[in-house]
Amino acid sequence: LSGFYGVLNPFDGVVPYRLEMQAKLKVDDKKNLYEFWGDSLYNELRKESNVILNLASKEYSKCIEKYLSEDDVFITCVFGELNEDGKIKVKATEAKMARGLMVRYMASNNITEIDDIKKFVDLSFKYSAEYSTDKEFVFLKQI
């Protein structure tokens, strides 16, 4: 997802730019990019399947979650580590790197079934069945 281009495909050409979805940018009569894109990003993702794997940041996934229906299966991947209290702590930079590596893993391995992403292991992150739910796949850093 891109605040500037919308939904991107793997080989789409893009010009380098710096624009965040949450930018307070008026476009036409819309007060921000969330309003500008409306449900069009969701509709584009939903064309092929009702299963949506969310590897986006909260900033970007917000523009999809708002439009989800009961028929949709929306699964978010969380990359973190357990702190002393047993709670999952997400380090933004590591999580961003892991999300990118997950995309590469899916493309390299031609992943078509959602459960196959559970086999992902990289940057010491490994799927945790104990902390995962049907809506959130948790990958914990192995220390």
Where are these regions (language model features)?
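Internal, well-folded beta-alpha domain core
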Residues: 2-133, 138-143
